[in-house]
Each structure stands twice: as structure tokens, then as C-alpha cells.
């Protein structure tokens, strides 16, 4: 009995909740402007790519 009422409550909550739908609406960043997206992605992936090279440079200069 309790399980049925809990299940009914959760399904009614899910049905009542609504969020914006569409491409790019479920992402934590905006994809509306392609140039800012390009800059953000280049900084994100470029920094991750350059970290090993910077570590090696630091180790070589340290000796």
C-alpha cells in the first residue's frame, strides 16, 4: 500500500516538472554563439593538451 502511494507521488511529480527542451538546452554551457563556444573549447582542450609538455619543461629546467 505504501509502495503504491510512493510510486504514484513520484510519477505525478515527474509529470508536473517541465524543463526546456531542444538541442543544447541540457548542457551546462551555451551553444548559441559558435565563436565563444570555439574559444571555450580551445582553452579547455588546449590546456589539457599542454599540461604534459609544461610538466616536462618544468622538470628539465629544474635540474
Curated annotation (Swiss-Prot):
This is Cytochrome c oxidase subunit 7C, mitochondrial. It comes from Macaca fascicularis (Crab-eating macaque). Component of the cytochrome c oxidase, the last enzyme in the mitochondrial electron transport chain which drives oxidative phosphorylation. The respiratory chain contains 3 multisubunit complexes succinate dehydrogenase (complex II, CII), ubiquinol-cytochrome c oxidoreductase (cytochrome b-c1 complex, complex III, CIII) and cytochrome c oxidase (complex IV, CIV), that cooperate to transfer electrons derived from NADH and succinate to molecular oxygen, creating an electrochemical gradient over the inner membrane that drives transmembrane transport and the ATP synthase. The modification N6-acetyllysine is found at residue 25. Residues 61-63 are mitochondrial intermembrane. GO terms for cellular component: mitochondrial inner membrane; respiratory chain complex IV. Keywords: Acetylation, Membrane, Mitochondrion, Mitochondrion inner membrane, Transit peptide, Transmembrane, Transmembrane helix. The modification N6-succinyllysine is found at residue 25. It is a single-pass membrane protein. Belongs to the cytochrome c oxidase VIIc family. Residues 1-16 form a transit peptide. Pathway: Energy metabolism; oxidative phosphorylation. One of its GO terms (biological process) is mitochondrial electron transport, cytochrome c to oxygen. The keyword Transmembrane applies. The chain crosses the membrane at residues 34-60. The gene is COX7C. Residues 17-33 are mitochondrial matrix. Coiled coil: none annotated.
